[in-house]
Each structure stands twice: as C-alpha cells, then as structure tokens.
Design a protein with these regions (language model features):
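Short, well-ordered strand-loop elements centered on a beta-strand within folded domains, enriched
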Residues: 54-63
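Short amphipathic alpha-helical face segments that pack within enzyme cores
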Residues: 71-76, 114-117
Length: 141
C-alpha cells in the first residue's frame, strides 16, 4: 500500500469510514414520500428520498454523482434521520453531520451543507405530499 492509502485509513474515524463504504442507503426509493435534489455550482448533485409512516421517517436513501465527501455526507444524513419525526430531522445541521463523522476535512464542509439542504427539500416535499397526496405520483427525477 502506498502512503496516501495508509493515511486515508489512519486519518479518518470509524464513522467516516463506515459512511464511505456502506452502500445500503445508496439507492432510489421508488414512490418516496419525500424527495429533494440539489446541484452545486461544481456540478455535484445529491438526491435524498424519504419514506414516511405515521409522521416518522421509516427509510431514507440517497443518490449522488459527487465526490467521496458528498457520498459520506449524504449517507450520514440518510443514516441519522431514520426513525426521526420530520420535525426532529429538521433539527439536523451541517455541524451535526460534521460532528458525527469526526474527520470530515474543513474544506469539504460544503458537502455537509449540501446534504442538509437536500434533506430540507425532501422534508418540505414530504409535507406537501401529506397535504396533497396526489402530487406524490408526479415524475420527480
């Protein structure tokens, strides 16, 4: 192994590494109750899908064409929101993601900000779909 590879494994927390390697939440949830999508000026796009039952996020997933840090942050958001109420999920902040990961480089904090912005869009969409359920079936992607 070269030094950069060794440094990557040694320089990151277990939570960061788990979110970097875990793939079960990286998927499109068909018929999601809430959906958010945001592209940054650099071209990275993050999508978040929420399944909501009885006011709680039963399942969350994401898709991105972004870098490793975009994956890690979106995966963290999907992980942290499951089981929370929509209001409880709104309490998450970029700092919540950064604190959970422990070793997200400061220059990549915009990835945490983007993931939280997309979560808020997905929550707003879920609330809109609660008020007007027929909108849930409109094409979103």
């Amino acid at each position: 192994m070269d030094q950069a590879t060794v440094d990557f494994w040694q320089n990151h927390s277990l939570q960061f590494l788990e979110m970097a390697l875990r793939t079960d939440k990286r998927q499109v949830l068909k018929d999601a109750d809430g959906y958010g999508k945001l592209s940054r000026e650099c071209g990275d796009t993050v999508e978040i899908f929420l399944m909501v039952r009885n006011g709680r996020i039963r399942s969350a997933a994401f898709e991105t064409d972004g870098c490793l840090f975009a994956v890690v942050c979106a995966n963290t958001v999907a992980h942290l929101v499951e089981g929370k109420t929509l209001q409880g999920a709104l309490a998450l902040t970029p700092d919540s993601v950064i604190d959970y990961l422990e070793t997200l480089p400061a220059e990549e904090s915009h990835c945490a900000e983007q993931a939280i912005q997309v979560l808020r869009l997905a929550i707003a969409n879920a609330r809109e779909n609660e008020r007007q359920p027929w909108k849930k079936f409109y094409a979103r992607r």
